[in-house]
Amino acid sequence: MYKRQLIVRKGETEHVKAVIEQLKSRDETVATEHSFEYRPWGMFENLLDSAACKVKRLTVDPGHHLSLQYHHKRSEHWVVVAGTATVQLGDDRHTLGAGHSIDIPLGAHHALGNDTDDPVVVIEVQMGSYFGEDDIVRVSDPYER
C-alpha cells in the first residue's frame, strides 16, 4: 500500500478542497478513506484493502474494550503482536499474548479488550464478501454507539 501526502505552500490551503474534489471525481479512495481512525477504545490503521481481504492494525488502550459484536458478511483472524488481549468468543473468554491468534467465524459474537496497563496491538485480517464498518452489529457497547 502506498502512503500519499498532500503538501501545499503556506497560504495556499484554499486549493486543498479543489484537489480533494478532483480525486473524488476520479474515484480515488484516498479522497474519502483515512489510514488512521480513532475510536473511544483506541485506534486502527488500514494496512490493506482489497477485494479478497482487509487488514487492520488495532491498538486498544489500557483498560478499554471494543463492543461485543458480530458480522453478517465477514470472518476475522486476530494476531496479537504486542501486549495481552482479552477475547470473548461466544460464551468463552481467552487471554492471548503476543504471537498468539484466534479465528472469529462469520456470525460469531466476539469482543476484544485490554485489561492491562499497556497497549494491546492486534493485526486483524478480515475475509468475506464485504468489509464496510456498517457490517458491525453491536450486541453491547461500553461507549453506547
Which role does the model predict for each range below?
Residues 32, 111-145:
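Double-stranded beta-helix
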Residues 1:
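Active-site loops and adjacent core secondary-structure elements that bind or stabilize anionic groups
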Residues 4-79, 84-102, 110, 131, ...:
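Left-handed beta-helix
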